[in-house]
Amino acid sequence: MKNKNDSNEQISLPKEQVDILMGLYSSDKINEAIDMIKALNDDYPNVPLLFNLLGACYNKLGQFDPAAQFFETAISIKPDYAEAFLNHGIVMREVGKLDHAAKSFKRAVEILPSYVEAHNKLGVTFIDLNKLEDGIEHLEW
């Protein structure tokens, strides 16, 4: 019998746990959320949502390097995770890496063409990069 930690298989996280986590995050109980996510990660390895939430927590704490790493982990587990690409782009903007931010936002839009927030952030980032036509295209889409 295989140990669940030896597998790349994703195990579903119970909705009740997700609701509790979202409540902690929304209430700015970030350290509690981080502790809960780390505990859940032991029982539910390779769940991209947990890594995305860890990244969001560290971003909220202003710890951008670990935030970016957690978003990248979420993306490596689920390469079509538009929200993780959006969040990665947000962190890249925070640290002034506009080219990296644009790539992440663009990937989010490629995955989910109707993703309004990703289009807006991509448009603003293109404008900041003096790519005005590209920026306007995403702001007016």
Language-model-detected regions and their locations in the chain:
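Alpha-helical segment of the N-proximal tetratricopeptide repeat
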Residues: K15-D43, A56
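Helix-start (N-cap) detector for alpha-helical repeat units in TPR-like alpha-solenoids
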Residues: P14, P48-L49, A82-E83, V116-E117
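TPR-adjacent "capping" and linker segments in tetratricopeptide-repeat scaffold/adaptor proteins
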Residues: K2-E16
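Canonical positions in the second alpha-helix
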Residues: L40, T73-A74, R107-A108, W141
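TPR/Sel1-like alpha-solenoid repeat signature
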Residues: L24, F51-Y58, F70, A84-V95, ...
